[in-house]
A protein has these predicted regions:
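Residue-level signal for mature regions of secreted extracellular proteins and peptides
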Residues: 16, 20-23, 198-201, 217, ...
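Short, hydrophobic secondary-structure boundary micro-motifs
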Residues: 39, 155, 252-253
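Residues within well-ordered alpha-helical secondary structure of globular protein domains
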Residues: 54-57, 82-85, 172-175, 227, ...
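Short cysteine clusters
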Residues: 23, 27-30, 205-208, 224, ...
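Radical SAM enzyme [4Fe-4S]-AdoMet core and its adjacent flexible, acidic
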Residues: 105-238, 242-243
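Conserved alpha-helical substructure of the radical SAM core
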Residues: 1-105, 109-110
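Flexible mid-to-C-terminal extensions adjoining Fe-S/redox cofactors in radical SAM and related proteins
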Residues: 1-11, 225-292
Length: 292
């Protein structure tokens, strides 16, 4: 197998670790089709620790724990500690439905930040999307608590329903003290796929794999959690460095339609909501409504 050398400009600096497919919610647009019946997959806690060590050796600067709901994995806090001990920042992408009191001390550690999804300023609309009654009140309360504690937080709002109160949700978040807010449309991937259609690469931002890499609960490596059908290897069989230097990785990047404007994409362009934060490749990708 030949080795492909990736330029330092596009080499992954962020690794998305989808540590579980389990989630208390079952959002109607979830790209990973996560839910209460999801599992932690084939990867063990030791496997995840090894991937984090590989990421550190490759000079990556951030690990994102995502799911599913990452806090449903029994080792999530240990994985946060592992990354921080190796000098890598951590983002925990949580639905903020259930936060145990003791978890706040983990989330408040230096080098850790939070991300979550929000859908409406009305409980009935928010809960219709998450399919879990009470999720609006619990997520809203935990957002307020994260802000109170000074934990860095970004929130993604996805437009799922016709006439959804996206603007009102943004204003409510701003009133709570949230300063980083992104909005996006639903991507037709995963649970939101159109009936009878296969995965469509034009639903991606066009820069998947450029600055980031994802590892799924199976150990499979893809350019992004959104492009999960573009499997380039498995960390249970090969090291991350070997996979990123392999032909399958290069072929996967080539299979993704390029951005319309040809400009570079921020390596932080990773899921900011259950259906991602990059605009589709057929549009000007990453042209987001993003309040700094």
């Amino acid at each position: 197998m030949s080795t492909v050398v990736e330029s330092t400009a596009t080499a992954p600096k962020v690794v998305e670790l989808e540590i579980t497919g389990a989630c208390q919610l079952q959002c109607t647009q979830c790209f990973a089709e996560s839910g209460p019946h999801g599992t932690h997959g084939a990867m063990t806690a030791d496997d995840w620790r090894r991937v984090i060590s590989d990421a550190a050796a490759l000079g990556m600067r951030e690990v994102q724990l995502i799911g599913g709901e990452p806090t449903m994995h029994p080792a999530w806090a240990e994985l946060v500690d592992r990354a921080l001990c190796l000098g890598i920042g951590v983002e925990v992408y949580s639905n903020l439905f259930h936060i145990k009191p003791g978890w706040w001390s983990v989330l408040a550690r230096e080098g850790v930040k939070l991300a979550t999804s929000y859908y409406s300023d009305r409980a009935e609309e928010h809960d219709a999307i998450t399919t879990r009654p009470g999720s609006y009140e619990r997520t809203r309360a935990h957002i307020a608590e994260a802000v109170r504690r000074g934990i860095p937080l970004r929130v993604g709002i996805v437009s799922v329903l016709r006439g959804q109160r996206v603007a009102e949700a943004r204003r409510e978040l701003e009133a709570l003290g949230v300063t980083q807010i992104r909005t996006d449309r639903t991507r037709h991937l995963g649970r939101a796929s159109l009936p009878g259609t296969e995965a469509d690469a034009t639903e991606l931002c066009g820069r998947c794999g450029h600055g980031q890499v994802a590892v799924l609960p199976s150990g499979e490596v893809t350019p992004c959690v959104m492009s999960r059908w573009l499997v380039t290897g498995n960390v249970r069989k090969s090291g991350l460095a070997a996979i990123l230097g392999g032909e399958s990785w290069a072929e996967a990047l080539h299979a993704i339609p390029a951005r319309a404007d040809g400009n570079s994409c921020d390596p932080d362009c990773k899921p900011a909501s259950d259906s991602g934060d990059c605009s589709p490749a057929e549009r000007d990708a990453c042209d987001l409504k993003y309040d700094e």
